[in-house]
């Protein structure tokens, strides 16, 4: 994926108060708020821990979707979908923790429950109630 697209997606997610991750257990969809993201190695990274329902659902079905509102209004949003790929490198965990220092009260780089991931085969589109969808990647 090209760097401008990655940076644009990361910036939209960083600037949204929260964004939402959708998973499924094979029968039902589940959505929960997320709020930590980091751009690293030309990828957008997120985190979870291996004690959550989200982690278990991702293990069953690694295809997820994210959604974030853009700006202050309610007429634009970003949808991102792809396949979760875990990255076990400590430097990626460090980048996540450095970009989101509030996580340091819960996790460390060598923490065995802290999982950092990116989306492979990522597609991202900005939707609006006023205009046609804009494909980012």
In which residue ranges do the predicted regions lie?
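Charged, amphipathic alpha-helical segments
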Residues: 4-7, 48-54, 101-102
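A short mixed-secondary-structure module that forms the rim of ligand-binding clefts
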Residues: 37-73
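Charged, gly/pro-rich active-site loop segments
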Residues: 78-137
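A short, Trp-centered hydrophobic/proline-enriched beta-strand micro-motif
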Residues: 11-26, 64-68
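A generic structural signal for short beta-strands and their flanking turns/coil linkers
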Residues: 15-17, 40-42, 60-64, 74-82, ...
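N-terminal leader/targeting helix
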Residues: 18-46
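Short glycine/serine/proline-enriched coil/turn segments at secondary-structure junctions
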Residues: 28, 74-76, 127
